[in-house]
Curated annotation (Swiss-Prot):
The keyword Cytoplasm applies. Signal peptide: none annotated. It comes from the Eukaryota. The keyword Phosphoprotein applies. One of its GO terms (cellular component) is cytoplasm. The modification Phosphoserine is found at residue 38. PROSITE patterns: LRAT (PS51934). Residues 138-233 form the LRAT domain. Belongs to the LRATD family. This is Protein LRATD1. Keywords: Cytoplasm, Phosphoprotein. GO terms for biological process: cell morphogenesis; cell motility.
């Protein structure tokens, strides 16, 4: 598509809600601990992004034409996007003292939290990329759903866990999300090569609820890219039997450099709580959405 896009994220913080929106407190998921970590993270050079790979469509996948280079959009000026102001909670996650996830802006290893119109994403993506799709709406509206994760397989197509089924859909039509971003670097695990990521996704097409061992779209998409059993439901030892260095800690970064930390016995539980916070209205658009989405050309 070759669009030159403004980066469209400004971040404000708001206080973390103290209760579950349903009114049911899940104590086992919200065990606060007086456990804080140094701001210095481990050297992550072994977790860098892989080289680019040409990806062929495995059996069962629709053809995935090669996507335009993710840098191609720098060479053209077309449909500049209005800047959005997001009120978005930032997270980091640890297993013991090892950082395994970071959605925190700033610093040398800060996450890129820029969001783009869904119609612009194919120009920024390559097969095997992880996408986070967002439903942004004006501040007075009810909270949007939790962010939806998917694997990009080329040709404007994604594979994702949606409504209890693993399916392949057009990126432009998936859930009518209006913006998204590439989130390959948020999890700090070593990624599989792009061809294997696409094969993992395609190999599970058509599975339905009773056959699926992931509890949400993020866990499925992340498993496709990293291949770690911890993303599967029940993929870890029973709760309460791990030593502290094997337990998980979610840090929620609040205003004034405050951090709320909670402990979990599995990555599955940590992801569930992180997504609950995301779905509780922390993601808001504070200005007009006019001209948000490019023409679908």
């Amino acid at each position: 598509m070759g669009n030159q896009l403004d980066r469209i994220t400004h971040l404000n913080y708001s206080e973390l809600p103290t209760g579950d929106p349903s009114g049911i407190e899940k104590d086992e998921l919200r065990v606060g601990v007086a456990y804080f970590f140094s701001d210095e993270e481990e050297d992550l050079d072994e977790r860098g992004q892989p080289d680019k790979f040409g990806v062929k469509a495995p059996p069962g996948c629709a053809p995935c034409p090669e996507s335009p280079s993710r840098h191609h959009h720098h060479h053209h000026h077309h449909h500049l996007l209005h800047q959005l102001v997001l009120n978005e909670t930032q997270f980091s996650a640890f297993r013991g003292q090892e950082c395994i996830f970071s959605k925190v802006s700033g610093g040398p290893q800060g996450a890129d939290l820029s969001v783009y119109a869904v119609t612009a994403l194919p120009a920024l993506c390559e097969p095997g990329d992880l996408l986070e799709l967002l439903w942004l709406q004006p501040a007075p509206e009810p909270p949007a759903p939790a962010p939806h994760w998917a694997v990009y397989v080329g040709g404007g197509q994604i594979i994702h866990l949606c409504q209890g089924e693993i399916r392949q859909d057009s990126l432009y039509e998936a859930g009518a999300a209006n913006v998204g971003r590439v989130v390959n670097s948020w999890y700090r695990y070593r990624p599989l090569v792009a061809e294997l990521v696409v094969q993992n996704a395609c190999g599970h097409l058509g599975l339905k609820s009773e056959e699926i061992c992931w509890t949400n779209s993020e866990s499925f998409a992340a498993w496709c890219r990293f291949g770690k059993r911890e993303f599967k439901a029940g993929g870890e030892v029973p709760a309460g039997t791990q030593p502290p260095q094997q337990q998980y800690y979610l840090k929620v970064h609040l205003a004034d450099n405050k951090v709320h930390t909670a402990r979990f016995h599995s990555l599955e539980d940590l992801i569930r709580e992180k997504r609950r916070i995301d779905a509780s209205g922390r993601l808001r658009v504070l200005q007009e959405l006019a001209d948000l989405v490019d023409d679908k050309e």
